[in-house]
Amino acid sequence: VILTPQAMTQPAETARGIAACNRRSKPILVSFMGGQNVMPGREELVASGLPDYESPERAVAALRAMCDYAAWLRRPPRVVTRFPVNRRRADRIIQRHLKTREYEIGEASAKDILRAYDFTVQPGQLAATAAEAVEAAGKLGYPIVMKIASPDVIHKSDVGGVKLNLNSPTAVLDAYDLMMMRIGARMPDARIHGVYVEKMCESGREVILGMVRDPQFGPMLMFGLGGIFVEVMKDVTFHIAPITQDEARQMLESTKSFALLKGVRGQAGVDFDAIATSLQRISQLVTDFPEIVEMDINPFIVAPPGRISVAADARITLKDSA
């Protein structure tokens, strides 16, 4: 019901008439517009328990929220999948870091935790020296990726901490020396454990999967466009864990990048089921281990259906017990 004051308008009488109708089962939303001229009517509405909205738009928004809530009440029971995982292996890694007060879990150990929860990660090896990096590359097979291994370097690409498509021992040695020189100059106080040498994975779309633990809502799962674009596009969505397959799918569809991931101009779309399942696995991981306060897989290389999607980089932060 919308009312604007005219010469013969009686706001109080109108409000009492609306209040009388409120005894029926139909919801009534009222917007009396006119400031002090309609104040007697607004007071009558408040006294009768009817909300009076400042504008019709706010009334419609409230009605939409009521409809959404009714639909939520009618939804079928939630089924949260529990996957068979190696929880004991993940627990050993987490407890080791807690014992040594290393609350930032680096890529190598973070990927070991992901493996325990059945994520696919590329074969890789931590190398403390340039010679070890060359040896690791020879074992893994070229081409390889080299990434700085440091708990203090979060955004590796920003400081020259990632080198792609290295195809020879000479390229590995040169990349190692240049990486150490650049990071030493830009972050002289950073703790450097060496480099992480990893087999190059097939190309695909880059997305980010993650979680941040909110003090009130608990673990909040995150999905969005990944790689370097997550900082620029800021197209991410969140959902409280634990999560169902349908809820994970709704997360994907709620982003602006969903249309891009479906495929444009002849490009194949990505395997959305693989992303949804991976979000469920993160949900299970962070529910199993409340010690995890933050984590992300960025990028998660997602391929078209029929190909394997890969966790290309990962980090996990544990709760500081001090």
Question: What function would you assign to each model-found segment?
Answer:
Residues 1-6, 11-322:
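ATP-dependent carboxylate/acyl-activation modules
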